[in-house]
């Protein structure tokens, strides 16, 4: 168990009334969750730079106009491991507009076999679909 706070940058990519998210599953809790794309902020890196790097690595595209929406503190457990994150939430857009036409966006991340999907904002309201920042 790590006793450090992990700073991350996540990107809100909008397409009409949908946002792009990855889906996860906590086997121990039996719960599914969603989270926007992004990842760890490296030492000396700004949040917008981290989001650019993560999208370049994971989605193979460049982003434009990343701007900070909020900074959140999140504590939770994943697979029984306590987590503590400072989450920099940025809104951005893809330079390659074809991503907005796809039902799924491939992710190139070692150790993670999945994709991102466009989900309606209403999908997260009042239901079992947990949104983790």
Predicted features and spans:
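Short connector loops at helix/strand junctions that flank enzyme active sites
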Residues: 6, 14, 36, 63, ...
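Active-site-adjacent beta-strand/loop module that shapes the phosphate/pyrophosphate-binding cleft
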Residues: 74-104
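Conserved Nudix-box catalytic region and its N-terminal flanking loop in Nudix hydrolases
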Residues: 18-57
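Conserved N-terminal beta-strand and adjoining loop/helix that marks the start
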Residues: 1-20, 40, 66, 91
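Short, well-ordered beta-strand micro-motif
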Residues: 13, 89-93, 117-122
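Nudix hydrolase/Nudix homology domain
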Residues: 29-33, 99-133
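A short coil-to-beta-strand element that immediately follows conserved catalytic motifs
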Residues: 62-71
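Short loop segments at secondary-structure junctions
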Residues: 16-18, 25, 92-98
């Amino acid at each position: 168990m790590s006793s450090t706070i992990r700073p991350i940058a996540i990107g809100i990519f909008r397409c009409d009334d949908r946002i792009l998210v990855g889906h996860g599953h906590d086997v121990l809790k039996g719960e599914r969750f969603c989270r926007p794309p992004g990842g760890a902020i490296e030492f000396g890196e700004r949040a917008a730079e981290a989001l650019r790097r993560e999208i370049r690595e994971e989605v193979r595209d460049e982003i434009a106009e990343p701007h900070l929406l909020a900074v959140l503190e999140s504590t939770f457990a994943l697979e029984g491991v306590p987590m503590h994150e400072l989450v920099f939430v940025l809104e951005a857009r893809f330079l390659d507009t074809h991503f907005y036409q796809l039902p799924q966006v491939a992710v190139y991340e070692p150790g993670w076999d999945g994709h991102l999907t466009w989900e309606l904002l209403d999908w997260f309201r009042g239901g079992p679909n947990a949104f983790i920042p």
